[in-house]
């Protein structure tokens, strides 16, 4: 699926702005990972990775299939003065161009819903995790209140259409959870679980 990088980024930088620091806090609280290498998969403009870098000592590797998105990410890196603590990497999540056991924390928000071969992607994410590594991958907006606020704003921007609300419900609903559970079983990832509620959204947790 082709995404208009500039259009997507405009929304991410404005409407979605409150989401990233809150999710970063939730990731840190759940995993306890604050040092080492973080891989932000399907990073878009890099806002989740930047929020994690701001709150930790992590080196963040921003990973996306889109060169246009990575151009935006490089701007985010510069704006947040992260040039010594970050880099960018282009590629596909089913064949991450990194060595085995090289990532302490893999994160991804929103990208997973575009992954066509989910079991293969999860398998490769597991491959790059260090022996004590974590992956925190899925979708959400940090809280129910923020979700409702964003849905309302997007409805205004879409001339009253509920298309965005419907997509959120679909992505964070039971069908997506079932798809995630099936993919984890297919991938044979025993040390994995799913977090799912209306506050935090829908997330896959993987331990090495």
Show the residue positions of the predicted features.
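C-terminal alpha-helical "lid/dimerization" subdomain adjacent to the S-adenosyl-L-methionine
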Residues: 11-16, 138-197, 201
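Short glycine-centered segments of the SAM/dcSAM-binding site in methyltransferase folds
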Residues: 37, 132-134
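C-terminal lobe and adjacent flexible extensions of AdoMet/dcAdoMet transferase-like proteins
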Residues: 203-208
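A short acidic, Gly/Pro-enriched loop at the edge of an enzyme's catalytic core
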Residues: 94-105
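Conserved class I S-adenosyl-L-methionine
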Residues: 1-34, 47-51, 163, 198-200
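A short SAM/SAH-binding and catalytic strip from SAM-dependent methyltransferases
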Residues: 105-118
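Class I SAM-dependent methyltransferase SAM/SAH-binding core
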Residues: 37-95
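A short glycine-rich, Lys/Arg-flanked "PGG" loop and its adjoining helix->strand segment in the class I
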Residues: 119-131
């Amino acid at each position: 699926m082709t995404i208009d990088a500039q259009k997507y980024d405009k929304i991410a930088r404005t409407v979605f702005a409150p989401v990233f620091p809150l999710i970063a806090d939730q990731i840190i609280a759940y995993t306890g990972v604050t040092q080492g290498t973080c891989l932000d998969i399907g990073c878009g403009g890099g806002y989740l990775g930047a929020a994690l870098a701001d709150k930790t000592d992590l080196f963040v590797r921003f990973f996306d299939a889109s060169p246009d998105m990575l151009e935006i990410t490089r701007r985010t890196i510069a704006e947040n003065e992260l040039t010594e603590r970050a880099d960018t990497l282009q590629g596909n999540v089913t064949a991450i161009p990194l060595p085995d056991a090289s990532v302490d924390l893999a994160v991804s928000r929103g990208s997973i819903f575009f992954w066509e071969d989910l079991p293969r992607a999860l398998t490769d994410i597991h491959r790059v995790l260090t022996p004590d590594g974590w992956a925190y991958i899925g979708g959400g907006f940090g809280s129910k209140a923020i979700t409702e606020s964003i849905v309302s704003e997007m409805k205004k921007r879409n001339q009253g259409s509920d298309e965005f609300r419907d997509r959120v419900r679909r992505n964070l609903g039971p069908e997506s959870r079932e798809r995630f559970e099936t993919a984890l079983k297919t991938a044979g990832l025993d040390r994995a679980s799913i977090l799912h509620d209306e506050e935090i959204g829908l997330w896959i947790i993987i331990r090495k």
